[in-house]
């Protein structure tokens, strides 16, 4: 376990408080950081955790992370809807030559992509609620908006424009969750578990995709509107889980301290760590957060203009957030998740729904691996290895599709062997994506920004994710209809750019508190040297203790040590 070497600080109440060196004095901590109260920062160790300690942390964070289930559920059911006969009859067009209903490329693209437009707008609109109403209440509000969108879609009958309006409102709620849930997770999570806990958001997104695939598989043989209305109706169950969960989880201690609610902030830190609010480590954490809030206040009120500040390196971090979220879509993952059923029918499989379930299963279990290892490997290594692995898989996938899938031309039968090989490399690709970029992109955005501009910066970064998801979702039917599997090479080029950007511009933040990450950026450390950077508060400590404590997985698995 590490101990801080910072001198003890005397912290006065209010934004203009003085912070000065004082000798260690043990005093009872009162509400609001009063004069002459001192926290002895030396030799204060984080609480030891046993089985119950870990379970409490993960159980408290899980309802927050369940917000990721909402966009995942939409991806899973939409991939099935566009191939359902009753859905096409209600919202498609009739082709007299074949006597069948179909979805045009434009309508199919809009059906998939309008959700993303709603998400982009929702993230921008609702992110500010986190600063005015608190993280928890803001999440409840966006979930209610999501439910309104679901009602509009379910009540649609032969009116595709009504369905699309519902889809946009549906997206407003999911987009708000995509900003607010990772934000709250990053602010209540212990430093050594932050990566894994934020990754739970992505894990639940993959869980939503998987269950979405299963739901449309189960209703695909219905011959009425229950074929698509039942999967839509199930979303009310998922939203209730989130709303009830918000009554149980702690509020962000950073938000509470910004509102001068210091006692509640200490209670929040204590609850997530299962210790007393008077525990010295809790007091030290509250002290550090308060110092960071005071430092931000000295810079003035937050504004949109501050996002472009070069002096505080916020602009650099905003560009990183935008590009990481953009690259997340340019991996090509939604090419498979949105159109997976369609793609695998094109390679000769009679039931593309079953293959989608296989892909959803690979996606879900691969993300579980990411949750377990992301705080051991680090952000940079995950992103670099992931980009390289996806690049190799996409090259092989596209090459087989171009050269081997149709040996007698596009109008001839497809090769079953080539089709099976494409499915195998799709699974490898999804493994590489789900264990690296899928969770880490959200971690990077959630932990990069100072609290003062966090809601604004995260909303812009996440909006770029949804904007690119819209573009890929809308234009993919046109592009694949024109260049077929050559489309994969476009994503290969993007993956090369991603690898280079991460290597040269993205710093390593594993083991650092949110306040220490701000110092990392401010000191201008080269990204490829950032893994060895030590925060000022830990300089001078022996090297083996210079990093924030990391979980001993053997102890965690055996539960042989730790107290609750």
Swiss-Prot record:
Q: Name its GO BP terms in alphabetical order.
A: carbohydrate transport; hexose transmembrane transport; mannitol transmembrane transport; sorbitol transmembrane transport
Entry-linked InterPro entries: MFS_dom (IPR020846), MFS_sugar_transport-like (IPR005828), MFS_Sugar_Transporters (IPR050360), MFS_trans_sf (IPR036259), Sugar/inositol_transpt (IPR003663), Sugar_transporter_CS (IPR005829)
Topology with respect to the bilayer: Multi-pass membrane protein
* A GO CC term assigned to this protein in UniProt: fungal-type vacuole
Q: Where is the composition biased (Basic and acidic residues)?
A: 1-12
Pfam families tied to this protein? Sugar_tr (PF00083)
Which UniProt keywords are present, listed alphabetically? Membrane, Repeat, Sugar transport, Transmembrane, Transmembrane helix, Transport
- The protein in question is named Hexose transporter HXT17
What organism is this sequence from?
Answer: Saccharomyces cerevisiae (strain ATCC 204508 / S288c) (Baker's yeast)
Which lineage? Eukaryota, Fungi, Dikarya, Ascomycota, Saccharomycotina
